[in-house]
Amino acid sequence: MFIDGKWINREDMDVINPYSLEVIKKIPALSREEAKEAIDTAEKYKEVMKNLPITKRYNILMNIAKQIKEKKEELAKILAIDAGKPIKQARVEVERSIGTFKLAAFYVKEHRDEVIPSDDRLIFTRREPVGIVGAITPFNFPLNLSAHKIAPAIATGNVIVHHPSSKAPLVCIELAKIIENALKKYNVPLGVYNLLTGAGEVVGDEIVVNEKVNMISFTGSSKVGELITKKAGFKKIALELGGVNPNIVLKDADLNKAVNALIKGSFIYAGQVCISVGMILVDESIADKFIEMFVNKAKVLNVGNPLDEKTDVGPLISVEHAEWVEKVVEKAIDEGGKLLLGGKRDKALFYPTILEVDRDNILCKTETFAPVIPIIRTNEEEMIDIANSTEYGLHSAIFTNDINKSLKFAENLEFGGVVINDSSLFRQDNMPFGGVKKSGLGREGVKYAMEEMSNIKTIIISK
């Protein structure tokens, strides 16, 4: 952990390689009292960050991006070992994180305040930092989703208290070293960024309830997100949570395009992406053909060691999660689901699994965070109703060549994002991103996160 510019090295908590199941490192786990002391210390730097010149913010962000680029392969290998992410997918995450820090640097200089028309007053606004941002980040994109919280926090002049997932913290430790170097280079006190490792129910909980923390930016499960809304009090909160993301294939869709996109959207990082394909709704008139093509493509995916360049699907984050997924699939079959492919587990590896189900099946209501895909044969009239029937509303997708139908679905789907002719997995780091219902509050995407992490002050001058 890194607190007030000092590294604290203890061996309190094991970090497990999800593929080999070996202990790869032992890291500190803060007590609640230590977390509280760290937040007390961080508070001293609020004025430092608030008054940090725009040019310094820009330079720090660009320097972080530069250092990440220099360590691209090293960071990708850490992601593969620590989070179980196939190496070719890990490289993509590192590249995206470089872009995220550069985006924040761009928006630092592009920010504009507003002048409000008035007959006899000069009225203008300015955005001010909230103070301390508690950034609580997940295991599945530990580098880029940390970037999505840290970069806009720096850009808006906030102090950061960063709590990474205990399941994949190692790349965040390396990121903290990179941030330390950037702060030193531009003579900024190191206490403006703090990395607090440990158990979520201890460290994460203290960040949420501590009155000195002004905002929580959390990515994780809807269950934990709901707890945060109950505990955070009057803090600002931005929650990017889960989903069972429906992907709709209409009868006029380009099937080759749909199948290729849905294979990627279903099985990248073993389905451990909040916007992975959650269920596929396919028009019954083309269902046989679609299912045959989809299953055949999934059959040839390579499952195995994340460090192998040929691996498409690596392990789930833990054996415990894989065992839970196995039970959910068994229940789905008990409820009448027809297993078309997979259903096999080997330790934390879960093989690509496809089932044909009806709309009431457990898989259509449960975020498995796994390479498990339910397919529903249905008709166009029922698709929107089925898609909107979940308690989530993160991303959805539709495949069609009819522009009128695509717009009709886009207007009626109750989701934060609707992707047309690509899978729900699509996300670009400069677009607004987030969900409705139990999928979250607020929006990420650097520009939009900067708005979340600042407060508008209105200044009125009488003539």
From Swiss-Prot:
User: Active-site positions, per UniProt?
Assistant: 240, 274
Q: Which reaction equation describes what this protein catalyses?
A: (S)-lactaldehyde + NAD(+) + H2O = (S)-lactate + NADH + 2 H(+)
Give a yes or no for keyword Oxidoreductase in this entry. yes
Using the record, list the residue span of the signal peptide; answer none if the entry has no such feature. Answer: none
**In terms of pH, how does activity behave?**
Optimum pH is 9. The activity remained constant to pH 10.0. Below pH 9, the activity gradually declined, and the enzyme was inactive at pH 6 or below.
Which positions does UniProt annotate for NAD(+) binding?
A: 220-225
Give the enzyme's EC designation.
Answer: 1.2.1.22
Superkingdom field: Archaea
| A single MF term (Gene Ontology) | lactaldehyde dehydrogenase (NAD+) activity
Q: What class of enzyme is it?
A: oxidoreductase
This protein's pathway: Cofactor biosynthesis; coenzyme F420 biosynthesis
* Sorted UniProt keywords: NAD, Oxidoreductase
User: Key word Transmembrane present in the record?
Assistant: no
Output the InterPro entries linked to this UniProt entry: Ald_DH/histidinol_DH (IPR016161), Ald_DH_C (IPR016163), Ald_DH_N (IPR016162), Aldehyde_DH_dom (IPR015590), ALDH-related_metabolic_enz (IPR051020), Lactaldehyde_DH (IPR053404)
Per the record, the similarity remark reads: Belongs to the aldehyde dehydrogenase family.
Please explain the role this protein plays, according to its UniProt record: Involved in F420 biosynthesis through the oxidation of lactaldehyde to lactate. The substrate preference order is propionaldehyde > DL-lactaldehyde, DL-glyceraldehyde > crotonaldehyde > glycolaldehyde > acetaldehyde, acrolein > formaldehyde. No activity was observed towards methylglyoxal or glyceraldehyde-3-phosphate. Has a preference for NAD over NADP.
Q: What quaternary arrangement does the UniProt entry report?
A: Homotetramer.
Protein name, per record: Lactaldehyde dehydrogenase
State the species of origin: Methanocaldococcus jannaschii (strain ATCC 43067 / DSM 2661 / JAL-1 / JCM 10045 / NBRC 100440) (Methanococcus jannaschii)
